[in-house]
Amino acid sequence: MNLYRLVSYAHLEHLRKVPQIPRSLLNMHREGLIIGSACEAGELFRAVLRGESEEKLMSIADMYDYLEIQPIGNNAFLMRNGTVDTEEGLRDLNRRIVALGDKMGKPVVATGDVHFLEPDDALFRSIIMHARGFDDAEQQAPLYFKTTDEMLEEFSYLGEEKAREVVITNPNMIADSCERMKAFLSEKGTYAPTFPGANDELRNMALKKAHEIYGDELPEVVQKRLDKELNSIIGNGYSSLYL
């Protein structure tokens, strides 16, 4: 239920071009949720990138249930913009997050920040990003859904044992911790919202407006058409959508 609440709050009360969840709201409704530290846009990665102290990093990481590291290709733009000098520098950022997780006893998970399924699908994302004004739209990061073997190869610099831990063991542990649930109780239907009294309210509103236009006694053709439309809407459970 907390996940539903947060999604609703984000879209209805905290929409700033994109849905947002304030930290205070997340803390209020955190029970039952598992929260990771995110990609390079997350506060932990950026703090590591800034070279913050270990004390500061631990304070930030304390918020999260697991820490994330990603393939260095995901963050190659940091080399293009001069923030990081080499690929080894990108690996060092991941190594620091791994060391932080080990020290704090938090699982570290290798995630892909997947935006598309196949490598060739990068073309479509580049088109979308170009339309949104990104200067480097054609220099797409390899954000496709990698296989287990590909991820093990990506993180081989951590050593075989640690690579298997972050690529296989810890992701499976997180997945096993997630409750299986259905978003809808029934697999059939259109899942329109339902409000108490919606059927009567819709019918009364329609009749009131019709009488305002045509008078106390509705013409037969109007009454038949009104009945047909209302019966279709109400009969299919869509009354609430029209209010």
Where are these regions (language model features)?
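Short coil/turn linker and secondary-structure boundary residues
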Residues: R16-I21, E52, L143-K146, L158-K162, ...
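Non-catalytic structural connector segments
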Residues: A110, E160-L243
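Domain-core and long-helix interface of multi-subunit machines
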Residues: R5-D121, K208-L243
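Short amphipathic alpha-helical patches
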Residues: L26-N27, T83, F124-R125, E138, ...
